[in-house]
Amino acid sequence: MLVMSITFSFVAVALLVYFYVKVRTSFSPDAYAKTMQQEVIKMIRDIRYEADIAVQMLEKKIGECNQVVRTIDRKLTLLNEEILKEHTARTLFRASGAGQETREEVCARPEHRSAPSRAGSSAAKPTPTKRGTIEVYNEKIIRDNGLRAESPLLKDAIIALSEKGLAPEFIAEKTGKPLGEVQLLINLSR
């Protein structure tokens, strides 16, 4: 029995030493540092993973924004070309004097022979000279059919811009036409 108690004593001392070393290493500053280092490494991995996902999403959004910018740039280029064409056409139209007639030409038409003074204003009437039954005026007038003389070109430009997907408000702003007139032209073209 003595042997057994000595054996148990050695086992107890061995267990005591083992648990002492185990507790001392588990709660030592080195153990805390090692545990913290492992947690920091794990957090760094998580942050890198989340950052990679965020960068991929950001790159995707940047690509979409670049596509939208290219589309807008293409539409603005087309719009500038159309505005330049419309401005050139308007300038040529005004320079050629098209759309203007003298009162002599208007009064020479059969439908205007009976009432030559209808087109004149009451403020300052030019003096007519008689040539048979046609009164000749030297003042120039512009035919007015409800729309301006340049409206066929402008109408085509408005319709083309609306077919390209531009908003009626934007078209009205850029062409100088009222919004209602632009919307009417767009709706009539459909």
From Swiss-Prot:
GO terms for cellular component: membrane. The keyword Membrane applies. It comes from the Bacteria. The chain crosses the membrane at residues 1-21. It is found in: Membrane. Residues 103-114 have a biased composition (Basic and acidic residues). It is a single-pass membrane protein. To B.burgdorferi BB0265. Keywords: Membrane, Transmembrane, Transmembrane helix. This is Uncharacterized protein TP_0711. Coiled coil: none annotated. Residues 103-130 are annotated as: Disordered. It comes from Treponema pallidum (strain Nichols).
